[in-house]
Amino acid sequence: MSTPGKENFRLKSYKNKSLNPDEMRRRREEEGLQLRKQKREEQLFKRRNVATAEEETEEEVMSDGGFHEAQINNMEMAPGGVITSDMTDMIFSNSPEQQLSATQKFRKLLSKEPNPPIDEVINTPGVVARFVEFLKRKENCTLQFESAWVLTNIASGNSLQTRNVIQAGAVPIFIELLSSEFEDVQEQAVWALGNIAGDSTMCRDYVLNCNILPPLLQLFSKQNRLTMTRNAVWALSNLCRGKSPPPEFAKVSPCLNVLSWLLFVSDTDVLADACWALSYLSDGPNDKIQAVIDAGVCRRLVELLMHNDYKVVSPALRAVGNIVTGDDIQTQVILNCSALQSLLHLLSSPKESIKKEACWTISNITAGNRAQIQTVIDANMFPALISILQTAEFRTRKEAAWAITNATSGGSAEQIKYLVELGCIKPLCDLLTVMDAKIVQVALNGLENILRLGEQEAKRNGSGINPYCALIEEAYGLDKIEFLQSHENQEIYQKAFDLIEHYFGTEDEDSSIAPQVDLSQQQYIFQQCEAPMEGFQL
């Protein structure tokens, strides 16, 4: 394990101390956070319950109130599916049959329309409160179910629409309905609460503060139908989700035990949402990471990296990646689960986002101790990383650059030489021309670490010649470093100046020679001329 003393010694050997261990591994506020912020098509935070034609037909046949159903269906509807006065009259009538029939009509409007008239429903005075009142009708489970369905679909709308459901007092009643003896009612209550929690961090915290977790977790202890389990784990993931601020960990950590066995359910939807929940819970300081590790989920998460559905692989990879942002011991737990072979496989994924997050995960492993860097070498991962550094999309190249530079920062002389022999210098030099200042710094730091090793070798063998200077010149790196002396970022131009002065000597600069800019590639263009044996004379 890396000791604080070793880390401090490593830092003191830098001229530029900006790349500290926190920057090397715990890149949560930058690349790591950016990875989490991206919109995921695989997971919806809100879901509308839409009946299929088959379900509708079955319902018509099984309905006891056939006359009332026909009465509703024959109502004169205004253009655009507006709510009729008959519907509101029936909602507020004292007849349970009329109440049910009208509620079903509202439900159909909110379920079938491509653009459901949610605003029209909530703007009809007293209607939302009436549906909440119907939730309390324990003697009429069908009315409870239909009302819950209506409110679920209202809560599937925008934040203002969701707030109407909350302000009508629905949340505590929905939580009570999680313990209903009728599974249809339970499931619809879960769905509604999932929609409300998925709206915003404020709604999520309100639902948590209403003490949803005990009855929700109790649902998992029963033999449920699959749709119930799917809805419940989805609601659970929404309760764990959110960064600004995250949920109070003490309120969501009790779900870890349930999540640990949900990882062994065969259904991909259940697996995906369980993995997302674990990725949210592991996204934070080391004590949260430790709680996730202590739940015993790491080995199964690593196994799921090889799942055949990206819907499962993406959140499993996110969770594994979050865990290795922890300390060396926490990172080792993942390594002990044989994660590297799975990660190597993901580096060749046709899905760019998977490839990128695999690189990000590996970059946090190479920020560990030398033994951990060696496991990455032994797994033969660096050839793939260097290939990615040369050919992948820029967002993926960035993560590969971090993985390689982190290895040069903490690696031994032999480990750094291995990276040079694999050909890491040329792609690092190529990154010096990109527009992203942070990645230019990462590439400069990697090259500096290599040059420092060369200087030590030159002193040790008495030759006085740094073997890596020539390799950087051959890769047109010297041109690029010299150009960076005029970079607008102070840290970059200072680092470039220091590298030239310390490793390449001072040479006259022709300020009239400036590279062109290729905006499509987000980088500068340098003429690729042959380097003379004595180096460049600019």
UniProtKB/Swiss-Prot annotation:
Q: Which regions are flagged for Basic and acidic residues bias?
A: 20-41
Single Gene Ontology MF annotation: nuclear import signal receptor activity
SUPFAM superfamilies reported in the protein's UniProt record:
ARM repeat (SSF48371)
What tissues harbor this protein? Low levels in all tissues examined.
Entry-linked SMART domains: ARM
Keyword Chloroplast carried by entry? no
Q: According to the UniProt record, where is the region NLS binding site (major)?
A: 149-241
A single GO BP: satellite cell activation involved in skeletal muscle regeneration
Modified sites of kind Phosphoserine: 63
Q: Which spans of this chain does UniProt mark as ARM repeats?
A: 77-117, 118-161, 162-206, 207-245, 246-290, 291-330, 331-372, 373-412, 413-457, 460-504
- Start and end residues of each stretch annotated as Disordered: 1-41
Q: Name all IBB domain ranges.
A: 1-57
Where is motif Nuclear localization signal found? 42-51
Record localization:
Cytoplasm; Nucleus
Question: Which residues does this entry mark as bearing N-acetylmethionine?
Answer: 1
Q: Which GO terms describe its cellular component?
A: cytosol; dendrite; glutamatergic synapse; NLS-dependent protein nuclear import complex; nucleoplasm; nucleus; postsynaptic density
Highest rank taxon of the organism:
Eukaryota
Describe the PTM: Polyubiquitinated in the presence of RAG1 (in vitro).
Residue ranges of the region described as Binding to RAG1: 245-437
User: In this chain, where does the modification Phosphothreonine occur?
Assistant: 3
InterPro entries in UniProt: ARM-like (IPR011989), ARM-type_fold (IPR016024), Arm_3 (IPR032413), Armadillo (IPR000225), Importin-a_IBB (IPR002652), Importin-a_IBB_sf (IPR036975), Importin_alpha (IPR024931)
Whom does it interact with, and what assembly results?
Answer: Heterodimer; with KPNB1. Interacts with NSMF; the interaction occurs in a calcium-independent manner after synaptic NMDA receptor stimulation and is required for nuclear import of NSMF but is competed by CABP1. Interacts with APEX1 (via its N-terminus). Interacts with CTNNBL1 (via its N-terminal). Interacts with AICDA (via its NLS). Interacts with ANP32E. Interacts with ZIC3. Interacts with SNAI1 (via zinc fingers). Interacts with DCAF8. Interacts with ITSN1 isoform 2. Interacts with TALDO1 isoform 1.
Copy the domain comment: Consists of an N-terminal hydrophilic region, a hydrophobic central region composed of 10 repeats, and a short hydrophilic C-terminus. The N-terminal hydrophilic region contains the importin beta binding domain (IBB domain), which is sufficient for binding importin beta and essential for nuclear protein import. The IBB domain is thought to act as an intrasteric autoregulatory sequence by interacting with the internal autoinhibitory NLS. Binding of KPNB1 probably overlaps the internal NLS and contributes to a high affinity for cytoplasmic NLS-containing cargo substrates. After dissociation of the importin/substrate complex in the nucleus the internal autohibitory NLS contributes to a low affinity for nuclear NLS-containing proteins.
According to its UniProt entry, what is the function of this protein? Functions in nuclear protein import as an adapter protein for nuclear receptor KPNB1. Binds specifically and directly to substrates containing either a simple or bipartite NLS motif. Docking of the importin/substrate complex to the nuclear pore complex (NPC) is mediated by KPNB1 through binding to nucleoporin FxFG repeats and the complex is subsequently translocated through the pore by an energy requiring, Ran-dependent mechanism.
Q: Which family does it belong to?
A: Belongs to the importin alpha family.
Q: What is this protein called?
A: Importin subunit alpha-5
Taxonomic lineage is: Eukaryota, Metazoa, Chordata, Craniata, Vertebrata
